[in-house]
Amino acid sequence: CYYPEHWDESLWLNDLQRMLKAGIGTIRIAEFAWNKFENEEGVFTFDFFDRFLDVVEQTDMKVIFCTPTATPPAWLTQKYPEVLQADQDGHIFYHGCRRHYNYNAPVYLEKTRIIVEELAQHYANRRCIVGWQIDNELNCQIGEFFSEADSVAFRVFLKEKYGTLNKLNEAWGTVFWNQTYTDWSQIYLPRHTPHNTSNPHLKLDSLRFYSESCISYCKLHYDILKKHLPKNVFVTTQGLFPHVNYNRLHDEALDFLTYDSYPMFGLSDEGGNRLKDRKWSMQLARIRGVGNEFGIMEQQSGPGGWYNRQLMPTPKPGQIRLWTYQSVANGADYVSYFRWRTCTFGTEIYWHGILNYDNQDNRRLQEITDIGREFEKLSDLAGKTYQAKVAILYDYDNEWDGETDVWHGPLRKYSNAGLFQ
């Protein structure tokens, strides 16, 4: 993963050449760069990334381009505050982090449509672009949504599902504790109640709605991109995050799914356990079951985290190689490392990439270079399939219902632990 907007243009060509020398043949760009294309509402400029892609095309590097909707610009959220996300009490998540928008504000859907259309038209025929990533980590950070736009859309979702309030009241058992609804406007996504205990059937439908909203938003991108892109250019996004039916997302809004693999998440806080850095194998097994192929869009390559949360120790010598081969052994046809060089500013100032702040070669770069040489001998493995002897049925309704069910919920933990260990 590479961020040309973080670095002086004089570094670009040398960075690309060093990556290619290390066996890195594809980079992902632009997922957080909306302002570089639309710094003022309705005024589109492409010169920055045009210059970067011109440099890329001096080399053999390939590019995965992104739609930059994970971080809407300040001008947008200031002028249209209804696009902002909210917590369960209605407190707004303001500009300054990421994933602070909601999927259902009509104005955000329109602004998304416009920026994706502009980018797809402008970059559709760039020969270095082999694929596109939609947004970035849909439902990461926030997997439940409580903005006003979400509640309005939730009522539409329920009307389409149940047709009448009588049928909804019957399905939800609202006669219990006098919860009966007599008007659609009385229904909200789960709000705080005594002991934070809401109607369990409303709760499950809300999680289904969150998934539906995510899939619909992803499909908005996908349909626009597919309209403009050459047939050999793929469209993907990452998983696995809360409250998304990834089998439907894959079938309706992606060519294939990718995964962000950070095996050391939280290891410092959780204490010693020889299996902890390999718990990601369970997720790799899950994503393997979503479609016929998958890739790793972000493979951990260094220590770190955000400046105020998420701790990851430095990978031991050989550990990046272990994780890379673990992904390949689980069926990954593509592995990309996060990130090329550690950023010197911002929230992820401690989230190390392959290179440290000093930009000097190090043991992590050498390890990845060695992996690249080994991969040349293993290239025939890409795309290969095999006949699995065992399958595990994964049911999204059961998974989501178990999140708040004090009786059956704990079985999720024990079942997963048993399968993994």
Please name every model-derived segment.
Residues 1-9, 30-49, 94-113, 138-143, ...:
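The substrate-binding groove and active-site-proximal loops of carbohydrate-active enzymes
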Residues 3-5, 30-33, 66-75, 130-139, ...:
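Short, solvent-exposed turn/loop segments enriched in Gly/Ser/Thr/Pro and often Arg
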Residues 5-21, 112-118, 239-250, 315-326, ...:
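Short, acidic/polar
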Residues 12-93, 116-120, 221-229:
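Aromatic-lined substrate-binding rim segments of carbohydrate-active enzymes
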Residues 19, 27, 56, 119, ...:
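Conserved, mostly hydrophobic/aromatic
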Residues 23-25, 57-63, 125-130, 229-234, ...:
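Short, well-ordered coil/turn segments that N-cap beta-strands
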Residues 89-256, 260-273, 277-282:
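Polysaccharide-binding and catalytic clefts of secreted carbohydrate-active enzymes
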Residues 187, 219, 231-232, 241, ...:
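Carbohydrate-binding surfaces of carbohydrate-active enzymes
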